[in-house]
């Protein structure tokens, strides 16, 4: 028995029929830093800005796939041709449960925010800002795995 010796081991577990390979490193998704959330809370308190959250409905379904993805249909809707060969589905967009869907949604949201004139912060890759002057500042922080975004703006958009 070796007392005081720590042995570190790694285990890579993949589920849903997916095998770990080199492309599995693309399954990450960026998350906003907790300190950044605290800074957004402080800014909104100091300047009486509105701080709210945005939940994107069915967000992952808006992201385009970056590779060909074929899926077996669920048992309740499977169809067969005349030679008893099963039909498969060719996916055009990401779906929930796809290993890369959160990363693809993060890339899609990044493109849309840049198109809308936001600039990505250098200190946190999940935070985008848009400002002309101090009264029209708009800060957007994205937290992809939870599919939640934080918005910090000078006025309450709801009145």
Which residues are covered by each model-predicted region?
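Long, low-complexity, charge-biased intrinsically disordered regions
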Residues: 1-159
């Amino acid at each position: 028995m070796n007392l005081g010796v720590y042995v570190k081991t790694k285990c890579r577990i993949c589920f849903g029929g997916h095998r770990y390979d080199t492309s599995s490193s693309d399954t990450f998704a960026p998350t906003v830093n907790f300190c950044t959330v605290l800074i957004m809370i402080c800014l909104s308190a100091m300047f009486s800005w509105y701080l709210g959250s945005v939940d994107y409905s069915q967000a992952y379904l808006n992201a385009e796939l970056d590779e060909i993805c074929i899926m077996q249909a669920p048992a309740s809707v499977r169809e067969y041709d005349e030679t008893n060969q099963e039909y498969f589905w060719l996916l055009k967009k990401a779906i929930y449960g796809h290993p890369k869907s959160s990363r693809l949604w993060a890339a899609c949201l990044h493109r849309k925010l840049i198109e809308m004139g936001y600039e990505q912060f250098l200190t946190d890759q999940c935070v985008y800002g848009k400002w002309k002057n101090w009264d029209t500042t708009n800060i957007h922080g994205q937290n992809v795995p939870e599919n939640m975004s934080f918005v910090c703006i000078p006025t309450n958009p709801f009145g």
